[in-house]
Curated annotation (Swiss-Prot):
PANTHER family: PEROXIDE STRESS RESISTANCE PROTEIN YAAA, PEROXIDE STRESS RESPONSE PROTEIN YAAA. GO terms for cellular component: cytosol. InterPro entries: YaaA. GO terms for biological process: response to hydroperoxide. NCBIfam families: PRK02101.1-4 (NF002543). This is UPF0246 protein spyM18_2163. Belongs to the UPF0246 family. It comes from Streptococcus pyogenes serotype M18 (strain MGAS8232).
Length: 243
């Protein structure tokens, strides 16, 4: 069985379905630090204006006082990649695929199933804090490595910020899809192409119930197709021709 890892997103939208917020034990230490930070501290840590930091501060305070509602993570996050993932009107098989084979890597919650209930928050591995004297990446590395050992065949749709959270020896069987546009024989890639394509790729995997590495090579989605000559055992390249 294939396991997919996807990143979080800064952009969020509030779904209709909500749950009580239950915070994992490993997240408690981070919450304690975040709630102790002033608006000015948060603005510096997030590199945002103080007005925006006030909103984030309130979210942390609400979490600490157990006032926060929680929402299925794949519905709460609404970045460009998420908007290109099929999230509504799923078949029973697609719903099972999304909730059992897709996991989200978070700097606050750890690695969680796509439908895990989470609260609105802003946090990533660029957030400049120390937990028990460790960076966020060092703090989460044992948890992330344990997940990798339990799920050796991972399809990683993660961005570069996650590269060194996992130890190298845990990623021997990983495959990272790469998405490129071809125009007049020239290949290019950029953030927008990649984010849209990640969502479309995951949707195609769900719709086709892909369970083997070879099944990924036959996918055609949003104009992309597998390019064997540019691909390696650990990097599957998908090309889209531009007019």
């Amino acid at each position: 069985m294939l396991t997919f890892l996807i990143p979080t997103a800064k952009e969020m939208t509030t779904p209709k379905e909500s749950h009580p917020h239950l915070l994992p034990q490993d997240s408690q230490a981070i919450l304690k630090i975040m709630t102790a930070m002033t608006t000015e501290d948060l603005a510096k840590s997030y590199r945002i204006k103080e007005e925006a930091a006030k909103k984030e501060q309130q979210r942390w305070q609400d979490m600490a006082s157990q006032q926060s509602l929680a929402y299925p993570a794949y519905q709460l996050f609404n970045g460009l990649m998420y908007r290109h993932i099929k999230r509504d009107k799923l078949t029973t098989q697609e719903q099972a695929y999304l909730t059992q084979q897709v996991y989200i890597t978070s700097s606050f919650y750890g690695i969680i199933p796509a439908n895990h209930p989470i609260a609105e928050h802003r946090h990533d591995f660029h957030t400049r804090i120390k937990i028990e004297g460790q960076s966020l990446k060092s703090y989460w590395r044992p948890c992330y490595n344990q997940f990798a050992k339990e799920h050796p065949q991972v399809i990683s749709l993660l961005s570069s910020e996650f590269d060194d959270v996992f130890s190298k020896d845990c990623k021997q069987l990983w495959i990272s899809p790469k998405f490129m546009a071809e125009k007049e024989g020239q290949f290019k890639t950029h953030s927008t192409i990649s984010k849209k394509a990640r969502g479309a790729f995951l949707t195609a995997c769900m719709e086709n119930n892909c369970q083997t590495v070879d099944s990924l090579k036959s996918l055609v989605f949003a104009g992309f197709y597998y390019h064997p000559d540019l691909s390696t055992d650990h990097e599957f390249v998908y090309i889209k021709k531009e007019a």
